[in-house]
Amino acid sequence: MSKITALFKELKATGKKGLIPFIAAGDPDPKQTVELMHALVRGGSSVIELGVPFSDPMADGPVIQRLSERALTHGVTLHSCLEMVKEFRKKDANTPVVLMGYANPVEQMGAERFATEAKAAGVDGVLVVDCPPEECVDFAARMRVAGIDPIFLLAPTSSQERIKGAAKIASGYIYYVSMRGVTGASHLNTQDVASIIPKIREETDIPIAVGFGISDAASAKAVSTSADAVVIGSQIIRLLEDAPSGQAVQSLETFIREIRDALDS
């Protein structure tokens, strides 16, 4: 059983929901990434999604595009992301870490080498944004052989066929994008989320995490009534952008604690 699967079983047994924050490796500073990861855990995160910066993040809105540009300016690569996970693992062997990014850096490294090095670094899951399930059957199989959960995106526009395809090859959890558009979009409709999630559950018992449009404790709590976990990304990036000098780590921990408390209430 993978670390992510075990975590969701434990959450279900205790009646809790998962909290999955997204931060980007190298933003706002590569030297701070591991410290921010530990702050996420102290705040009550269940899984950490660590973003691998890419020069053309097509699924991301302006907030995450800005962070990708900053991280790339700092020279962050897929290799340095793996080094950050390795450093994080020196103090935390338990919290699952999912790498989230685009196919190009993985293709440049090679899927086989990536799987080997990611597992050695302590990566538990991988979500390749531009890798739809019907095109990534072999990639998913390679990840599973290496002991890494392949995680896939589904959206309001996903056909039942695509839902079935993702259900067949995904493990860990499925990331349901709660609205059309790019990350950081607003106008979250929790009723729409609640109506579509049962269609996914018809095909799989894999936990479902919902992201896009979740920006505060209230929206996280509302989504959690139908989802197994909530994902928060753009709001965290905004918080880190706006945090006074020297206060980013504490601001992040406080924000995550507020979300965790709301989910547990």
UniProtKB/Swiss-Prot annotation:
Pathway linked to the protein: Amino-acid biosynthesis; L-tryptophan biosynthesis; L-tryptophan from chorismate: step 5/5
Gene3D superfamilies associated with the record: Aldolase class I
Active-site residues (renumbered): E49 (proton acceptor), D60 (proton acceptor)
NCBIfam families: trpA (TIGR00262)
Protein name: Tryptophan synthase alpha chain
Catalytic activity: (1S,2R)-1-C-(indol-3-yl)glycerol 3-phosphate + L-serine = D-glyceraldehyde 3-phosphate + L-tryptophan + H2O
Its job: The alpha subunit is responsible for the aldol cleavage of indoleglycerol phosphate to indole and glyceraldehyde 3-phosphate.
Family matches, as InterPro entries: Aldolase_TIM, RibuloseP-bd_barrel, Trp_synthase_alpha_AS, Trp_synthase_suA
Signal peptide: none
The protein's enzyme class: lyase
Membership in a protein family: Belongs to the TrpA family.
Source species of the chain: Polynucleobacter necessarius subsp. necessarius (strain STIR1)
Gene Ontology molecular-function annotations: tryptophan synthase activity
Gene: trpA
Keyword terms: Amino-acid biosynthesis, Aromatic amino acid biosynthesis, Lyase, Tryptophan biosynthesis
Oligomeric form and interacting partners: Tetramer of two alpha and two beta chains.
Cellular component per GO, a single term: cytosol
Enzyme Commission code(s) on record: 4.2.1.20
